[in-house]
Amino acid sequence: YRILSSVQENVFFNGYLSHYAEVVNRISAKVTKVEGNSARHEATFMVTESTSGRQNEIPVWGEEYPSVFMRDELGTYDIEKKYFMPVVRDVPIFPRRDVKVGESWTAEGHEAHDMRRSFDIQEPWIVPFSAHYTYTGTVKEEGRTLHVIEGRYNIYYDSPTVKDRASLTSDLPATTMGFSHQTLYWDNHKGALSRYNEEFRIVIETVFGNTFEFQGVAQAEVSDFVAPSVEKIP
């Protein structure tokens, strides 16, 4: 399957608008193995970013990220620390029961951010959260029935690695705050998301007292979904 996602965001530094950015992520993924209730996904994320409104403007930046992960029937990821993609993981997570329209539930998830360029952090920067979901009903799109889920989570995370701030010689994220409001369109026949829309705001406060703020919208759509013939291990 393939996913095309895009982000449009304003980026602020210490309260002042730094620049506007548009990030496009072209994802190609394949399910290569099924083990019990989990499936192995092998994916390539091709990310390009264009910016405007900054003095040292970089018209287009791009990078390719490989990723391999297991995801179970409820949506939980099992992924090695070396992989930077996907950014949002364990969304959505379903309960172990049938969900009725109007019903809500909560589940843990996390975001994984690439901080190599900003802070020289060589592993994904993991930010946990607790998400609240509500199943709001169904919609018809191109003859398909999609199940609509509203997902929301707030973030407030103090980094455990920067407690001894006086000994630090380089800036690092100290506190990450923000929110994400998502509308998820789930295709029950395929057992996967069909598309989603998101509004978000993320603020990172650093050890040296700087703030980076990202606010904007995102959207993604799955295409070329093919039911593969994969190796199945009981």
What is each of the regions a protein language model found here?
Residues 1-63, 112-234:
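Acidic, serine/threonine-rich low-complexity disordered tracts
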Residues 72-79, 162-167:
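Short, positively charged
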Residues 67, 81-91:
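Short, structured beta-strand/loop micro-motifs enriched in basic residues and often containing a Trp
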